[in-house]
């Protein structure tokens, strides 16, 4: 079985917030490496390249999107989901250390840690 790490960008069927539809989209793994190595699930946040609206305070830009395996500038949305690892279609890349730091900052703010 593939071992996923925090900060990996994966392609997954991600549910819409109303749970009525599912769309294949990139997501970033936010669960810890220890959790990922022992669990059948991973915890993810949605990634979007739809930059029409300004970035909200609980979102962060992926500055090094090419290292993340993304084709265009993207942001990490605040939509969090837990999915079975078997639903991962493929690993696209991983966040740079700068983008990982930005994600950790957003997680601390979003979850009041």
Regions from the language model: what does each represent?
Residues 1-113:
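Conserved functional hotspots at enzyme active or ligand-binding sites that engage polyanionic ligands
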